[in-house]
Curated annotation (Swiss-Prot):
Binding annotation for Mg(2+) 2: D298, D300
Pfam families, sorted: DNAG_N, Toprim_2, Zn_ribbon_DnaG
MF terms (GO), sorted A to Z: DNA binding; DNA-directed RNA polymerase activity; zinc ion binding
Leading EC class: transferase
Organism domain of life: Bacteria
Occurrences of domain Toprim (ranges): 248-329
Species the sequence originates in: Thermotoga maritima (strain ATCC 43589 / DSM 3109 / JCM 10099 / NBRC 100826 / MSB8)
Reaction(s) the record says it catalyses: ssDNA + n NTP = ssDNA/pppN(pN)n-1 hybrid + (n-1) diphosphate
Name the record gives this protein: DNA primase
């Protein structure tokens, strides 16, 4: 059996527009493509292909589906045959999955399944582990229902299971279930309570672990493997998708204990992200079942950032988004533990449309007691307004303008004029001095964080000439080549705040490459200007006319270089 994740990977890698254009003549219309329908006779085109959603739809005959179904219908072939063709096109080898019992995938999921069964038995024997779960509000029935297990310290359970399956220790490490400590192999999750993480087909492909004491990290997920990708996996999605169409929405949370709290409170469509925020790959999964979501992340700055990042991508895919905040508690799990049954349902009923959250987030991240702070706050919101306008969220813009006007005590028409202006320095507040919303440092940091393919080029630039000390410190730290998320996690608060303000205050460039080129050019000019300043100092200190003439000549050459640029 071919796992759902692999099928989704094939659809992600294959360009649906490219495939369909081999059969019909597609014409671009906005963000979609249009053609005469290949499935029925018509004179006016009503067949549309949406590359962002990776689907096609005909408004005439109702034909619709993904790239696999299109190939099936056009060629009259089976699902398996269509998948084989597209897999070849995507460069994905399906031979690993053809016989589940003997394939590597089959071996992998059987290993996780058998190891999990042993972990469940260990939990039954551990009073400490059961007491911890009960302290978190889980009954005996909950513990069994959610599949909790426990891995004793210095455990070698997975090694014993692997030996019985003729799986080598090297494979065990590669599968992410064990690791080597010194000269011995141990279970990766030793000393932790674990919960199974399943793929879309309901097979266990990873574990989530929680330390019983104060050990760090407190939470630990399995590492990425060939069959487990954090950005492609949502905790509890395999169950939530079955009822999502009936319920009508998903609840997106930040951790598995939060998702389980929602389940205990009778919300069957709660899922948890396994990364910092909701990924685009996960959003595509959700869109197949419902385009209505309620975001409910932690009630702190990190949770707000995750909400903003998730919201940005959800709007790109034209979702209907509400935001719920577990105030005054830190997360949904704590709210449920403190307030009890019905508390999470009540919170969801009080959730508000995303534009109100944007206003609140801006108030949290920007100091609105100064003109500069108000500028940053409004620039942050302006970027969102531009996105909302492009996606047709016009009523939401109206709500946002009204909310900001009330908050800042500035007339709505002035707020709206600022949001619609081309230049961010037309501030609807009094300022004695104008300033740029961002400089080269912020611009380069924005590109570095959002465009992975540009990072190498950015690090090759003359970054020492950046005037912003935060920008210099940022690039000094990220240039070490370590995992970006881990590096940022260790940043001091001031630098983290600077990064967030940078991300949120700069609108996405239409052409990132050109934007980088412009910023690079500014750095070159800045380097020349520094050299000119150095020469001016040398001229003042020159001991004779000959030396002064030489220095002046050098200065003139540099000024010409600037002029030519």
């Amino acid at each position: 059996m071919i796992p759902r994740e692999v099928i989704e990977e094939i659809k992600e890698k294959v360009d649906i527009v490219e495939v369909i254009s081999e059969y019909v003549n597609l014409t671009r219309v906005g963000s979609s493509y249009r053609a005469l329908c290949p499935f029925h006779s018509e004179t006016n085109p009503s067949f549309y292909v949406h590359p962002g959603l990776k689907i096609y739809h005909c408004f005439g005959c109702g034909a619709s589906g993904d790239v696999i179904k299109f190939l099936q219908e056009m060629e009259g072939i089976s699902f398996q045959e269509a998948l084989e063709r597209l897999a070849k096109r995507a460069g994905i080898d399906l031979s690993l999955y053809r016989t589940e019992g003997t394939s590597e995938y089959g071996k992998y999921i059987r290993l996780y399944e058998e190891t999990w069964k042993r972990y469940v038995k260990e939990l039954e024997k551990s009073k400490e582990a059961k007491d911890y779960l009960k302290s978190r509000g889980f009954s005996e029935e909950d513990i069994a229902k959610f599949g909790f297990g426990y891995v004793p310290k210095r455990s070698s359970i997975s090694i014993e299971v692997a030996e019985g399956m003729n799986i080598t220790l090297e494979e065990l490490v590669r599968y992410g279930i064990a690791l080597k400590k010194g000269d011995r192999f141990v279970d990766r999750f030793e000393g932790r309570i674990v919960v199974p993480i399943k793929n879309d087909s309901g097979h266990i492909v990873a574990f989530g672990g929680r330390a019983l004491g104060n050990e760090e990290p407190k939470y630990l997920n399995s590492p990425e493997t060939r069959y487990f990708s954090k950005k492609k996996t949502l905790f509890l999605f395999d169950e939530a998708k079955k009822v999502a169409k009936e319920v009508g929405f998903f609840v997106i949370t930040e951790g598995y204990f939060d998702a389980l709290a929602f389940r205990k409170d009778g919300i069957p469509t709660a899922v948890a992200v396994l990364g910092a925020s909701l990924s685009r790959e996960a959003i595509l999964k959700l869109s197949a079942y419902s385009k209505n979501v309620i975001l409910c992340f932690d009630n702190d700055k990190a949770g707000f950032r995750a909400t903003l990042k998730s919201l940005e991508d959800l709007l790109d895919y034209e979702f209907n988004v509400l935001v719920a905040t577990p105030s005054p508690y830190k997360d949904p799990d704590e709210l449920f533990q403190k307030e009890g049954e019905g508390s999470l349902k009540k919170m969801l009923k009080n959730s508000r449309s995303f534009e109100y959250f944007l206003v609140t987030a801006g108030e949290v991240f920007f100091d609105r007691n100064s003109p500069a702070g108000v500028r940053s706050y409004l620039s942050f919101l302006k970027g969102w307004v531009q996105k909302m306008r492009r996606k047709g969220y016009l009523k939401h813009i109206e709500n946002l303008v009204n909310e900001v006007s009330s908050s800042l005590q500035i007339p709505e028409n002035q707020i709206l004029n600022f949001f619609e202006s081309d230049r961010s320095n037309t501030m609807p507040v009094h300022e004695t001095k104008s300033s740029k919303v961002y400089d080269e440092g912020r611009g380069l940091a924005y590109l570095f964080l959002n465009y992975e393919d540009l990072r190498e080029k950015i690090l090759e630039l003359d970054l020492e000439v950046l005037e912003d000390k935060n920008a210099r410190e940022f690039f000094k730290r990220v240039s070490l080549g370590e995992d970006l998320n881990k590096v940022i996690e260790n940043f001091p608060k001031e630098l983290k705040d600077w990064i967030f303000e940078t991300i949120e205050s700069i609108p996405p460039p239409k052409d990132p490459e050109k934007f980088l080129g412009d910023l690079s050019e500014k750095l070159k000019i800045r380097r020349i200007e520094r050299r000119i300043a150095e020469i001016d100092d040398m001229i003042k200190k020159a001991s004779n006319d000959e030396e002064r003439r030489l220095l002046l000549s050098m200065k003139v050459d540099l000024l010409r270089k600037i002029k030519r640029r």
